[in-house]
């Protein structure tokens, strides 16, 4: 993303990446230094607690697990981000809570329950963004077509 926006499109950008895994952060910072990306840095930390900026133009979440996606979306809205791109990961929070007597014949199958929880969670996230004034789309990124 940095390469595309900074090198190809020639935007004057700064990108901060967050992750909880120290090894991931170390590796990403090594790559940033290797390629001379001076305004690309990675920090170990939780998006829910991050206070390093007051305003951003774009927020991207990539496989932010469980409620980390929700915290990132709330931060993006709070920062009044112009663009939000979110690729959520697992949705364990709703998966643990979803119970419905009528749907029990379907929900008893773990895979179907997991997918239903993911769809409902993504729908609720899209509605939250729309309620906050954003246009929202839900798309599926499938590796089958790549």
Question: Language-model segments: what does each one mean?
Answer:
Residues 1-10:
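Conserved SAM-binding loop of SAM-dependent methyltransferases across substrates and taxa
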Residues 14-19:
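Conserved SAM-binding motif I beta-strand of class I
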Residues 27-54:
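S-adenosyl-L-methionine
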Residues 67-75:
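A short, conserved alpha-helix within the catalytic core of class I
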Residues 82-94:
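Conserved beta-strand signature within the Rossmann-like core of class I S-adenosyl-L-methionine
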Residues 119-132:
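Short alpha-helix
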Residues 135-142:
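Conserved S-adenosyl-L-methionine
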Residues 144-146:
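Conserved small/polar residues in nucleotide/adenosyl-binding loops
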């Amino acid at each position: 993303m940095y390469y595309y926006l900074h090198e190809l499109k020639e935007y004057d950008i700064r990108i901060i990446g967050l992750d909880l895994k120290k090894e991931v952060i170390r590796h990403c910072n090594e790559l940033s230094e290797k390629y001379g990306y001076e305004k690309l840095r990675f920090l170990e930390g939780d998006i829910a607690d991050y206070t390093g900026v007051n305003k951003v133009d774009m927020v991207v979440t990539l496989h932010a697990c469980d409620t980390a996606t929700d915290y990132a979306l709330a931060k993006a809205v709070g920062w009044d981000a112009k663009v939000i791109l979110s690729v959520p990961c697992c949705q364990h929070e709703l998966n643990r809570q979803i119970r419905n007597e009528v749907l029990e014949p379907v929900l008893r199958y773990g895979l179907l329950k997991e997918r239903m929880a993911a769809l409902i969670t993504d729908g609720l996230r899209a509605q939250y963004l729309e309620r906050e004034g954003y246009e929202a789309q839900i798309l599926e990124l499938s590796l089958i077509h790549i």
